[in-house]
Amino acid sequence: ALLDQGDLIAAMSIEGQLGTDQTLRSQLHQDLRPHPGQAVSANNMFSALSGSEIIASHRHGDGVVQDAYSLRCIPQVHGAVRDAVAQARRVLEIELNAVTDNPLIFPGLEGARNIEDQIVSAGHFHGMPLALVMSYVKAAIPVLASISERRLNKLVDPATNDGLPAFLIGNEDGTESGFMIVQYTAAAIVNDLATRAHPASVYSIPTSANAEDHVSMGANEARHVLDMAQDLGKVIALEIYTAAQALEFRKDMINAARQLASGHDSAALASKINGAPGTEDADYAAFMAEVEALRAELAEAAEYTPGRPVAAALAAVRRHIAFMSADRAMDGEVQRMVDLVEHGELLMAARAAQ
């Protein structure tokens, strides 16, 4: 469920960032680079963006050739994490159905001369199969957390968020910090996850007077994975918190432009555009033709909305947390977001809307 929620919230960030859905098309992943997890994540996000008027509004002619890696390469990164977890699951299922006792007793063993010959002291108890896949998952967790934090950072940074307010707060005098501390928090958690990703399985310390001279430390690895997965959920919750704010701004900005265009003639609309040429300039006529075309297009456009699953997830967020129009205490809201992730409420809302 945590992986599916990561895909859903990545889709919300794509909407807020004005990213494209074309990199999520199934033929790119199933046909050309068919890693199973990659195809699943791409399909999850493409479905979450279905029906998005925001995505459709800038599909052509926005001048963006390639999105940043944290948007364009989500299926490849999320998918690799999925495949790591899938491998761990395969090993766990084998272990759950395996015999790991010691010694092992084989009554009637062919060639056995006595009862002692029917008893084999083997090594099925050794935890290395589990330890190594836990190390694999430990390495994957900060990878997923890191790309989530990078998307969050893009949404709050005015240099990269494509016109959204700095730190997603509407003041222009710089007196409010908005979602700045949310990014600080995510960065701190990601750093902590990265420092804990070092594999315990590569450090064997002999026990039992060297009778057990090579051990897996698998229990430590499993405990680390449990704790780290909880912190990964916190990073995903912080991205949801931020992406919901960004998406509200994005919707309002696009719809405000539509309303502005429908309520003004071309000359009035042109007067509100920074850097517009004067009436005596040589390129004024061409500029006005472009303004008229823009006005007509915006005036006829329907209200811009995100994809249906993303919109449902956003509505679920808003049932618990209001849009932030001014700085306020955020600790309680962050905890509510963590609880929403833990209980899977946003994912259930999104799936019901598909």
Enumerate the language-model features and the residues they cover:
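C-terminal auxiliary extensions adjacent to catalytic cores
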Residues: 1-354
